[in-house]
Regions:
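Glycine-rich phosphate-binding loops of nucleotide-dependent enzymes
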Residues: 1-255
């Protein structure tokens, strides 16, 4: 199966069941949104997929390969990238250097070669630099390449998080509330960026509380409630589902 699949996944913490018997698929070139009230299990699912947690039952596969017992760095190398709700940047480093750090996951030169500045390590550094610059150009951040990341505005920090994730050359991209704190103009720009990323045949799974953004951006929506799947389908179908409206969308619309 192409994409990433959760197969009857359950996660319990000392008797508290955070996710129960959950199954869904995130496919290439599809933007899938994972929505639900606070405490529904969305962050737990991201942590399960990225290897920060392990399922209590069930399994997670990518292109047919079982990821359930792999550590986070191996999952990243397999092709699963992630951005975080709070940008995980190094404020004292430049924008370009931040992306280069993330791109190191695709590096092959050993620490000894790098420390001795051997020709292979220098070639590797040049390749990593170009990979990072490619992502900055794609996200229209190249003009900020030499600027310290700590002084970049929030909207551009969100894009920098995306650039860092893309620099790992993912085939699946996990985005944790990418629109949080953005202006309407920045949200529109973010939507355009995600559509362009989708055009690269990358599978996108996003958690987002901005329902207008979700309904305008996502191709497919999975709705959680108390750790279980409440509904699944197109954005339009989910928005009209009375169970979803009662459990979540009605309250989100009132907020």
């Amino acid at each position: 199966m192409r994409g990433i699949a959760l197969e009857t996944v359950t996660k319990a913490f000392e008797g508290l069941v955070a996710v129960f018997d959950l199954s869904f698929v995130v496919r290439p070139a599809v933007i899938t949104a994972l929505i639900g009230p606070n405490g529904a299990g969305k962050t737990t699912i991201f942590n399960l997929i990225s290897g920060l947690l392990r399922p209590s039952a069930g399994r997670i596969t990518f292109e047919g390969r079982d990821l359930t017992r792999l550590p986070p760095h191996e999952i990243c190398r397999v092709g699963i990238g992630r951005s975080f709700q709070t940008p995980q940047t190094f404020g004292h480093m430049t924008v370009l250097e931040n992306v280069m750090v993330a791109a190191q996951v695709r590096g092959s030169a050993g620490w000894l070669a790098a420390g001795l500045r051997l020709p292979a390590a220098l070639r590797e550094e040049a390749r990593i630099r170009e990979l990072a610059l490619t992502q900055l150009r794609f996200l229209e951040l190249a003009a900020l390449a030499t600027r310290p990341a700590g002084i970049v505005p929030l909207g551009q920090q969100r894009l920098l998080e995306l650039a860092r994730a893309l620099a790992t050359e993912p085939r699946v991209l996990l985005l944790d509330e990418p629109a949080a704190g953005l202006t309407q103009a920045e949200v529109r720009a973010l939507r355009d960026v995600l559509l362009r990323i989708r055009g690269r045949e990358i599978a996108i799974l996003l958690v987002e509380h901005n329902m207008r953004f979700v309904l305008r951006t996502a191709d497919h929506v999975v709705v959680l409630n108390h750790g279980q799947k409440l509904a699944e389908g197109s954005a339009g179908d989910v928005a009209r589902d009375p169970r979803v409206v009662a459990a979540y969308l009605g309250r989100a619309g009132e907020a």
